[in-house]
UniProtKB/Swiss-Prot annotation:
PANTHER family: BIFUNCTIONAL PROTEIN GLMU (PTHR43584:SF3), NUCLEOTIDYL TRANSFERASE (PTHR43584). Its EC number is 2.7.7.23, 2.3.1.157. CDD domains: GT2_GlmU_N_bac, LbH_GlmU_C. The gene is glmU. Mg(2+) binds at residues 102, 225. Keywords: Acyltransferase, Cell shape, Cell wall biogenesis/degradation, Cytoplasm, Magnesium, Metal-binding, Multifunctional enzyme, Nucleotidyltransferase, Peptidoglycan synthesis, Repeat, Transferase. Its cofactor is Mg(2+). Acetyl-CoA binds at residues 379, 385-386, 404, 422, 439. This is Bifunctional protein GlmU. Pfam families: Hexapep (PF00132), NTP_transf_3 (PF12804). UDP-N-acetyl-alpha-D-glucosamine binds at residues 8-11, 22, 73, 78-79, 100-102, 137, 152, 167, 225, 332, 350, 365, 376. Homotrimer. GO terms for biological process: cell morphogenesis; cell wall organization; lipid A biosynthetic process; peptidoglycan biosynthetic process; regulation of cell shape; UDP-N-acetylglucosamine biosynthetic process. NCBIfam families: glmU.
Length: 461
């Protein structure tokens, strides 16, 4: 079966009250439209066609890199009119799958079933029963249960509005009859629009069987029209992600307080994740990784046995096995920690590599640096990497000991097994195996008295 996925994404989304097109709002870190595109890609369709409209330049700027055919709907006159814009991309022998850019939770298995029901004499239609069907087109069946037509709510009679089975808008149909029915669409309805749903009655009139498929859960076909619905779908999505991770062996201390806004590309055994953790981008977690509360990770690789303690922020970093990071640590992009490294509280590491067993435990900034094996960096150490024009590197060789409150003014090299005395400002390379310090000699002044404050005269005096 040759399938063309047609994603309708031209709606303005006025109820979002946003300058951003509705389909560019995000769930799970991805635009609504990108969720739908990924579904089409997973189905291995021959071509994906995206019909866009409101905020078209923004949509193309954000997602124009996707390998899809983009077609503009300059005047928005309904779903039937949107499909008409793509008619030149529809082959007679192809199966057209109509999806919506604001329905992001649809499952691949559901759509595969729908496609299976579309054939030479049948039209596949995705419907769902809702306790509150307000706002949806109703599925009208005859006494034997055969689908006859779809009636939009504004055009429905009171009896038809009582029907709980509704149209999701998602359907699959062969190209040749679809093109024929599109030509016959009329806009003589309450909205003055061309309804794609009208093709159902045309199909029935020609003897086609309407094969209605139901999703596993109504959540799959929920759309986004306002911020409240966006938040509701975000929670539904995150519940699914949390359940999937627990099924893969992850311990989540509270699944309701975990957000995955990307994908875990590698997952080891016995991973534990505490509350209020956010994972973004591509994340790799090795065996027995422990992630503490209130941690943010983005595009990060974490080796086995690593502990990331509370309130740490890590982005674009690689952390070697058995390392310990935090609490309140920050690793910025292109930071690479080897095995057994310790990064402690209120330490920031930026674009630096730190070799096996080295420790930066307290209140330090390590930027544009290379730190060797077994190095101890004392509290309050700063690599002064920026001269106002360019960044420069600091190199600390194996076994060095950096005393507290040290400034290393780059470019500078600290030699192997060197010791830097506390409170030093190092501006030149230091030799191996010796003590280097640059602080002024301590002086005690005997008999010195602290100045006294002038005594204020009272009013009585």
């Amino acid at each position: 079966m040759e399938v063309i996925a047609l994603i309708l994404a031209a709606g303005q989304g006025t109820r979002m009250r946003s300058g951003l097109p509705k389909v560019l709002h995000r769930i799970g870190g991805l635009c609504l439209l990108e969720h739908v595109y990924r579904l089409a890609a997973a189905l291995e369709v021959r071509e994906t066609v995206i019909v866009y409209g409101h905020g078209g330049e923004q949509a193309l700027s954000a997602l124009g890199h996707l390998p899809a055919t983009w077609i503009e709907q300059k005047k928005r006159r309904g779903t039937g009119h949107a499909v008409m814009q793509a008619v030149d991309r529809i082959g007679d022998d192809s199966t057209v799958l109509v999806l919506y850019g604001d329905v992001p939770l649809l499952r691949r298995e559901t759509v595969e079933t729908l496609l299976h029901h579309a054939g030479e004499s049948s039209l596949g239609l995705l419907t769902v029963e809702l306790d509150n069907p307000t706002g949806y087109g109703r599925i009208i069946r005859d006494a034997s249960g055969r689908v006859l037509r779809i009636v939009e709510e504004k055009d429905a009679t009171p009896e038809e509005r009582a029907v709980r089975e509704v149209n999701t808008g998602i359907l699959a149909v062969e190209g040749a009859p679809l093109k024929r029915w599109l030509k016959a669409l009329r806009n003589d309805n309450a909205q003055g629009e061309y309804y794609l749903t009208d093709i159902v009655a045309m199909a029935v009139a020609e003897g086609y069987f309407i094969d209605a498929t139901h999703p596993t859960s109504p959540d799959e076909v929920l759309g986004v029209n306002d911020r409240r619905q966006l938040a509701e779908l975000e929670r539904i999505y995150q519940v699914h992600q949390a359940r999937a991770l627990m099924e893969r062996g992850v311990t989540l201390r509270d699944p309701a307080r975990f957000d995955l806004r990307g994908e875990i590309v590698e997952l080891g055994r016995d991973v534990e994740i505490d509350v209020n953790v956010i994972l973004e981008g591509r994340i790799a977690l090795g065996d027995e990784v422990r992630i503490g509360p209130n941690v943010y990770l983005k595009d990060t690789v974490i080796g086995p046995g690593v502990a990331v303690l509370a309130n740490s922020v890590i982005e674009g970093a690689v952390i070697g096995a058995g390392s310990r990071v935090g609490p309140f640590a920050r690793l910025r992009p292109e930071s690479v920690l080897a095995e057994g490294v310790h990064i402690g509280n209120f330490v920031e590491v930026k674009q630096s590599d730190i070799a096996v067993g080295s420790k930066v435990n307290h209140l330090s900034y390590i930027g544009d640096a290379s730190i060797g094996r077994g190095v101890n960096v004392g509290a309050g150490t700063i690599t002064c990497n920026y001269d106002g024009v360019a960044k420069h590197r600091t190199i600390i060789e194996d076994g060095a000991f950096i005393g507290s409150d040290t400034q290393l003014v780059a470019p500078v090299r600290v030699g192997r097994n060197a010791t830097i005395g506390a409170g030093s400002t190092i501006t030149r390379d230091t030799p191996e195996d010796c003590l280097t310090l640059s602080r002024a000699r301590q002086l005690s002044v005997e008999g010195w008295k602290r100045p006294e404050k002038a005594r204020k005269e009272s009013c009585a005096e």
